[in-house]
Each structure stands twice: as structure tokens, then as C-alpha cells.
Amino acid sequence: MYTIPFQTFDWSSIKKEEHPGTTGTSFWQIFFVNGLRIRRVEYSKNYLADHWCTKGHIVYCLEGEFVSELETGEKFILKKGMSYVVSDGLSSHRSSTNDGATLLIIDGNFLKPVLADQPA
């Protein structure tokens, strides 16, 4: 169980980290709190992630449009106002965008799969 007291934070005060993709660049602003990683991520035009991600996320598209491609070949177009969720170790995925996008991404231990003999 997580205990997170009420708090605010200003994204404009959080430094952007640059993460080059196969093409384009992503810029991450990260806020950590009690086992959660909350990120505001901006994808540049023509961005393609440089790896298949196996981490779980809750993703919300704040601006623009991007494609979430699964390692199986399935592709999902997410536009402003759309979300997806996936647990750790399921559905390896990567992102791409032609025109850029801004996302809110939340991940942490709560997205780890529960084993059959463990209580939920």
C-alpha cells in the first residue's frame, strides 16, 4: 500500500532530460514519489524509440498523436485525450510519431504482475 500525501509540483521547474531515439529525440521531465515515476515526455517530429520497452506504464496523450507498436506487429494510434495501460513484462512496445507528441507516463511497482500464489 502506498501513502502519498497531497502535493503539487510545477513541470516548468523540472529539468528536461534528452533521450535520443533511433530517429528524433524524446525529452523527459521526471517526478518521483513513493515508488511512482511520473513523467512528462515530449517526442520530437519523426521520433522512433531506440528499443522495445518491457516496462509497464499508464500513458495519457496530452498533445499530438503517436503510434504504440507492439513487438507482435500490432500498431495503435493514440491521439490527444487517449490512453493505454500495460503491466511489466507484457506486450513489449515502442513509440513513434511523425509530427511530435506530449505524453504523461506513470509507472512503478504497482504495474508488476501478481503471481498466482500471491494476494492481489
Predicted segments, located by residue:
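Ligand-binding loop in jelly-roll beta-barrel domains
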Residues: 88-114
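Short histidine-centered beta-strand/loop micro-motifs
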Residues: 48-54, 70, 94-96
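A short, N-terminal "cap"/entry segment at the start of jelly-roll beta-barrel domains
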Residues: 1-40, 120
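Conserved short histidine dyad/triad with adjacent acidic residue
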Residues: 34-53, 87-90
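Conserved hydrophobic/aromatic beta-strand scaffold that supports enzyme active sites
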Residues: 38-42, 58, 75, 83
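Short beta-strand segments in beta-sandwich/barrel cores
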Residues: 48, 65-69, 83
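Short acidic-glycine-tyrosine-enriched beta hairpin
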Residues: 72-89
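Short, conserved beta-strand element in jelly-roll/cupin
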Residues: 52-68
